[in-house]
Amino acid sequence: MPDFDAIITGGGIVGATAALCLARRDRRVLLVDSKVPQTSGLNDEFDIRTVALSPRSINLLESLGAMVDVRRESIKRIRVWEREGTATIVFDANEIGAKALAEVVEVSALVNQLWRNLVDRVEVRAPSTIDAVECSGDAVELIIDEDVVSAACLVVAEGRESSTLKQLGISAQNYGSMGRAIGTVARTVDPHDGCALQHFGDGILAFLPLPEERTVSVVWSLPTGRYDELLTLDRKAFAAALTHESESALGDVTEVGERVGFPFGQSLVPDFNPLPRALIIGDAARTVHPLAGQGVNLGLEDVQGIQEVAQHLKDDMGEIDMWRRFAIRRRARARVMLKLMDFFDRTYGASGPYGRWARNLGIRTINKVPAVKYQLMREAMGLGPLATLY
């Protein structure tokens, strides 16, 4: 008999949530990570790393008691527009009778709460090193810190730079846009009123509302040359650049915090169940353009799918047929999202009069067909049929 029903590698939002979901189904779970998250108290300043969670993701995390003491702010509207042309679209929660389209959450606070909830429910090895992985039809064996540990199922949730996938010889294929982005927290003259802003111009600039009404989380996806230039500006000059690029949508940007740069891209593994008893979820399975704001939400959809499948399995967590269906459906969902994001990126990136004309026509069509807009919002909120494709 294996030592565990499941070994989960990666203790971020997706991996820790998966561990808690399986544990509450009375499964024996081992969570392995190369590091331990910082568990210090909350700072006065909002974390640079934020995530926009769909209502479905919020419901899952609340059911696990993971949203306690986690600061968050509702996104009630999303306005998307471009510098040239008139391609503007607004998504409003009121249009579908919802309180919010999403909630912006601090990553560090959420991970800390998830890890606190792991105590006495899940065995955790961190910081630990996985030296070898072997998957067979009978069990999965890992060498962790020179100890041999077995499980009925391996769940890889380590993110885009997964060392476990490298050991298994599995690599993701690039899918469309690649680039770099700058993240920070900014203060503005005007209040955000719960509205997220996304501007297509010199790259893609997003303002996400934070609990303080004149504070926003900033993610600016940029071409390489422009990225290098902006990252070297002093804070005053960078604030001025944000004011200009956002077209003063919230008045002047008066202050910016520490900036972090990070790469982004779209990628997809060939198979979410590439070997017997092995599953790949979250950013380890696929990465999407930050304009989507859906990376973590897709990973939490994976977790809900795993929870659903585990509920129908009796003893053996590694039963092959059920996981094949799960893997095929989750990858299909990922392909739809990747193609949609690539379409938006190319559409808004098209220059010239014909590009603007086509873009404006498409956006006006969406605005005039409530059913299309309604379905787009429901899918983004994790409530549409594609979101439950597992």
Regions found by a protein language model. Name each.
Residues 61, 146-148, 154, 158-261:
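Conserved FAD-binding catalytic core of PHBH/FMO-like flavoproteins
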Residues 2-3, 59-62, 72-167, 175-180:
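Conserved N-terminal helical subregion
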Residues 308-390:
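C-terminal helical "tail/cap" subdomain of flavin- and related membrane-associated enzymes
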Residues 45-70:
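N-terminal glycine-rich dinucleotide-binding loop that anchors FAD/FMN and/or NAD(P) in oxidoreductases
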Residues 14, 37, 161:
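Conserved Rossmann-like nucleotide-cofactor binding loop
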Residues 23-46:
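Glycine-rich FAD pyrophosphate-binding loop
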Residues 230-320:
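FAD/FMN-dependent oxidoreductases across multiple families
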Residues 4-31:
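N-terminal Rossmann-like FAD-binding beta1-loop-alpha1 element of flavoenzymes
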